[in-house]
């Protein structure tokens, strides 16, 4: 699996639609200060489900929408799409290519798309479990994140290693199963109480 392209339109400093295409192999984005490199990284984090405007270096989520300049009007939406080559089927989906997109309007309305079909943030998160690609994955390291990791709490570092080792999805499934089991045990207690009352 590798990143094939990033399409950005109306996101932060990208007023016009731009498509970055990446050949297979190691890829980097270089450029002078202020040219938008960090905004590209923010765009990838955003399309993967980042919900914190602070993590995207903004005050609120509408700050990701191009706000205009002296010569350009503000735009009414931001759109980002990433396309991944999935020919090795690292992602649990039966497509050779997977495109995840996110659109946000100034009204606050937003949507996620998976291969052009509307989906939930939960679907995007589940697709990327244990790949290191999720919004909190180790594959996207923003400004200041290394210091945060090194000075972070042991539990936070453990979460990062769990993600890298591929055991996060099992922990989440276990947690959901334990919760369901507890709910069923409570239901069983209620049924037994009702049966006891009926037998009296």
Q: Where in this protein do the model-derived segments appear?
A:
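Gly/Lys-enriched N-terminal cap/neck module of very large, oligomeric protein machines
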Residues: 2-200
């Amino acid at each position: 699996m590798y990143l094939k392209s990033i399409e950005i339109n109306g996101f932060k400093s990208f007023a016009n639609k731009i498509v970055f295409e990446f050949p297979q192999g190691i890829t980097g984005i270089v450029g002078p200060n202020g040219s938008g490199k960090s905004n590209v990284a923010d765009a990838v984090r955003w399309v993967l489900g980042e919900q914190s405007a602070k993590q995207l270096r903004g005050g609120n989520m509408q700050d990701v929408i191009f706000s205009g300049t002296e010569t350009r009007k503000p735009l009414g939406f931001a759109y980002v799409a990433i396309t991944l080559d999935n020919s090795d089927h690292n992602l649990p989906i039966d497509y050779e290519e997977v495109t995840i997109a996110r659109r946000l309007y100034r009204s606050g309305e937003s949507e996620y798309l998976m291969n052009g079909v509307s989906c939930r943030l939960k679907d995007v998160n589940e697709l990327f479990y244990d790949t290191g690609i999720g919004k909190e994955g180790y594959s996207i390291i923003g400004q200041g994140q290394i210091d945060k990791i090194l000075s972070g709490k042991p539990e936070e570092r453990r979460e990062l290693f769990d993600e890298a080792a591929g055991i996060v999805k099992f922990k989440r499934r276990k947690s959901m199963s334990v919760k369901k089991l507890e709910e069923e045990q409570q239901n069983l207690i209620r049924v037994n109480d009702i049966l006891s009352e009926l037998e009296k």
